[in-house]
Amino acid sequence: MAASKVKQDMPPPGGYGPIDYKRNLPRRGLSGYSMLAIGIGTLIYGHWSIMKWNRERRRLQIEDFEARIALLPLLQAETDRRTLQMLRENLEEEAIIMKDVPDWKVGESVFHTTRWVPPLIGELYGLRTTEEALHASHGFMWYM
């Protein structure tokens, strides 16, 4: 068996040309320093705008508090007037209910004191409907 001669591929005469192996990426976008400067500038502007808004919000909050403080005596007087009206209506109802009970004193204080004690919700709304009592104790938070 005759061995066949293998022909090996060889470089062209004079060799191959030089191979360019460096990365040749095009420049894209801003440099790192300019992006850092833009980021810091954005942070400073955001901080400044938040401080400005917080000052405005604080000024509006102070204005609201001053308005509430100015209206507080009026609202307290309205609440006191409503409470006294309800107590008077309760005393009239108590007089009607307890008229046949001997030795019953209408409006006698259960606290045995001469000082003013704000009435409890149950005392004010004891003779009222359940809806009124629920509205007074829970406001608009109940859904029944």
Swiss-Prot record:
A single GO cellular-component term on record: respiratory chain complex I
* Ranges annotated as spanning the membrane: 30-51
Q: By its UniProt entry, which Pfam families does this protein fall under?
A: GRIM-19 (PF06212)
Indicate how the chain sits in the lipid bilayer: Single-pass membrane protein
What InterPro entries is this protein classified in? GRIM-19
Residues recorded as bearing N-acetylalanine in the entry? 2
Location relative to the cell: Mitochondrion inner membrane; Nucleus
Q: Which UniProt keywords apply?
A: Acetylation, Electron transport, Membrane, Mitochondrion, Mitochondrion inner membrane, Nucleus, Respiratory chain, Transmembrane, Transmembrane helix, Transport
One BP term from GO: positive regulation of protein catabolic process
Instruction: Look up keyword Acetylation and say if it applies.
Output: yes
In which broad location class does this protein mainly occur, judging by the first location in its UniProt entry? Answer: mitochondrion
Q: Which domain of life is it from?
A: Eukaryota
Q: Give the family per the record.
A: Belongs to the complex I NDUFA13 subunit family.
Assembly, per entry = Complex I is composed of 45 different subunits. Interacts with CARD15, but not with CARD4. Interacts with STAT3, but not with STAT1, STAT2 and STAT5A. Interacts with OLFM4.
Summarize the protein's role.
Accessory subunit of the mitochondrial membrane respiratory chain NADH dehydrogenase (Complex I), that is believed not to be involved in catalysis. Complex I functions in the transfer of electrons from NADH to the respiratory chain. The immediate electron acceptor for the enzyme is believed to be ubiquinone. Involved in the interferon/all-trans-retinoic acid (IFN/RA) induced cell death. This apoptotic activity is inhibited by interaction with viral IRF1. Prevents the transactivation of STAT3 target genes.
Protein's recorded name: NADH dehydrogenase [ubiquinone] 1 alpha subcomplex subunit 13
- Native source organism of the sequence: Pan troglodytes
